[in-house]
Amino acid sequence: MDIQLINIGFGNIVSANRVIAIVSPESAPIKRIISDARERGQLIDATYGRRTRAVIITDSSHVVLSAIQPETVAHRFVVNKEVQANSN
């Protein structure tokens, strides 16, 4: 199993293999997930003080905040997967 890394903005990188969901932070349930993760100490803020535009949820229950759009992060996953497929 190869480790696939995805840039989530400002030089921050997450493991593509660990990501469960990439969602928008606008809804109340997602805001609750962010709040709960902050209380548990499992919130990673990678926004550099900018507005949160994407919330990345991992299989270890960590929640990562990113300042780039969810569509952009998803596109990077697709491109990364295509590159991996072509290299094999």
UniProtKB/Swiss-Prot annotation:
Query: What superkingdom heads the lineage?
Result: Bacteria
Name the Pfam families on file: RemA-like
Annotated InterPro entries: RemA-like (IPR007169)
Name the PANTHER family on file.
REGULATORY PROTEIN SSL2874-RELATED (PTHR38449:SF1), REGULATORY PROTEIN TM_1690-RELATED (PTHR38449)
Query: So what family is this one in?
Result: Belongs to the RemA family.
Name under which the protein is recorded: Putative regulatory protein PCC7424_3427
The upper taxonomy is: Bacteria, Bacillati, Cyanobacteriota, Cyanophyceae, Oscillatoriophycideae
